[in-house]
Amino acid sequence: MTKPDLASLEKTIEKAFDERDGINTATRGEVREAVEQSLILLDRGEVRVAEKQADGNWHVNQWLKKAVLLSFRLNPMEVIKGGPGQSSWWDKVPSKFDGWTANEFEKAGFRAVPNCIVRHSAYIAPNAILMPSFVNLGAYVDKGAMIDTWATVGSCAQIGKNVHLSGGVGIGGVLEPMQAGPTIIEDNCFIGARSEVVEGCIVREGSVLGMGVFIGKSTKIVDRATGEVFYGEVPPYSVVVAGTMPGKNVPGENWGPSLYCAVIVKRADEKTRSKTSINELLRD
């Protein structure tokens, strides 16, 4: 689409979102068409909820996130085919693969293992691999990414090139609870098994999170070498493991419970990453 077309879509979506209390499954015309077109563009990867700028900062296209939210008001519940044993589901969002044949899969160029679930409006780039996992609507999964078994990519989350989300990893979405910006995993990151990154946090390029690291906006991310504390963002090429920090003493005692934190144990630049296995990086 041309820029004027996108500008027109954005204007319609913004106005509709301000008047969302009056929007329902009976709504027709310009609003429905704008929402449906926005979801199609997201599904194709022609637009995305967040884009990295030249200065390294991420710009969030809030109107696209609003289009995703409006779709829940517009779309009725319906039977979704493809359940186990020829059963069905009952939902408002169809599968990305609804109606696909071998031609569509070959053109898309990614691998979709049986029992992976991708909802319409999520984009999956060529050479990505989807094990039995869940990718929610509005998400963007870039080239060469591996979404391993039982991993979850939340609504509108941004997964970079060659990212590996290990088994059971959770990447938070923006819709429930409502977040200002999506959770972002930049290019060439490795997220260890059962780790969680949520609440619009950013893991910068080339970082490695060990198994069971949990990062939200209030999580202290402590650089062991400098003592610096980060919130909401893992610096580039950081190697991060789960840790604890001393807590305040309980009243009348000289002890207190320790509190969880994430610890940057080292920095591994691009050259080091290319020569070192993930397991070696995570060893202290």
Curated annotation (Swiss-Prot):
What Pfam family is a match for this entry? Hexapep_2
**For substrate, which residues are the binding ones?**
111, 148
What InterPro entries does the record point to?
DapD_Trfase_Hexpep_rpt_fam, Hexapep, Hexapep_transf_CS, THP_succinylTrfase_dom1, THP_succinylTrfase_N_sf, Trans_hexapeptide_repeat, Trimer_LpxA-like_sf
**GO BP, sorted A to Z:** diaminopimelate biosynthetic process; lysine biosynthetic process via diaminopimelate
Q: Cross-referenced CDD domains, in alphabetical order?
A: LbH_THP_succinylT
Protein's gene: dapD
Q: In which pathway does it act?
A: Amino-acid biosynthesis; L-lysine biosynthesis via DAP pathway; LL-2,6-diaminopimelate from (S)-tetrahydrodipicolinate (succinylase route): step 1/3
Q: What is this protein called?
A: 2,3,4,5-tetrahydropyridine-2,6-dicarboxylate N-succinyltransferase
GO CC, alphabetical: cytoplasm
Q: Which keywords has UniProt assigned to this entry?
A: Acyltransferase, Amino-acid biosynthesis, Cytoplasm, Diaminopimelate biosynthesis, Lysine biosynthesis, Repeat, Transferase
The entry sums up its family as follows: Belongs to the transferase hexapeptide repeat family.
Q: Which HAMAP family match?
A: DapD
E.C. designation(s): 2.3.1.117
Could you describe the subunit structure of this protein?
Answer: Homotrimer.
What reactions does this protein catalyze?
A: (S)-2,3,4,5-tetrahydrodipicolinate + succinyl-CoA + H2O = (S)-2-succinylamino-6-oxoheptanedioate + CoA
**One term of GO molecular function:** 2,3,4,5-tetrahydropyridine-2,6-dicarboxylate N-succinyltransferase activity
Where does the UniProt annotation locate this protein? Cytoplasm
Q: Which Gene3D superfamilies match?
A: Hexapeptide repeat proteins, Tetrahydrodipicolinate-N-succinyltransferase, N-terminal domain
Superkingdom to which the source organism belongs: Bacteria
